[in-house]
């Protein structure tokens, strides 16, 4: 393994080239095995699991307060999603048109949002405020609660339409949280209503780098573990939490299979000890569950969280808890492909979407 000398916060970044062998997905496809293309979130657990992982990762973490704030937000998201009101959904004609064009049926940038999402946003703030005792975030919550419908819709447009300059970065995670509830509810309700129909509401789309349900960018990819022990890579949607299959060792931005590398963080002390001893005998068992998959062709990257190394990984939580990796990979000249709506920073990517 080649050791990269970039270091930050008592961690060094290691660089591993991708294996030239066929990925398990490619082997399965060649053998005729059907891999589910789409994994939809579970209403009862999607935000609850995120909250649990955020609390787990917050322990002794430099970003403890922010991770715990995001955990409180996920708690309220979970509560409200269980009894979300009815909202307008695409009819059969609209679904057929989207399928015929190989487009997402609930596009984030163009969907006419139901006013119920604004009610959900205000209910979320009302429930969240008492959970933020003595937190600086209380001021942001109170300020957002004073937004008019027009102001709130404008901020939502800025957020969903590629991070326009007028976006309020302090309030964006809270607005995003309400939009996540709304889009997750729409996806699940539409699947429940029409999932057994001959023409399923969601399928493959032309742009495989974006969510087939809402056309949003991924937050990260996740190497899932199935019942037979297989490991399959899925991209995790930043907005609706749907996951769609993409074979491993393939760039999630340009789709190249050349020049793919995996970069990860190791404590400096352990890194030096392994180097002097020629590698730890337990190195494989101690491999980090979060890596950055980088592409030499387009100079983009996306994190991957690996369930085979830590069954508790959750893409949004583990992405937030590994920002040091983002900093080091960015310093190496790579640009992030995906987005985490809980923490927006930097300028919009040329492809669209705030980083």
Regions found by a protein language model. Name each.
Residues 37-198:
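N-terminal alpha-helical interaction blocks
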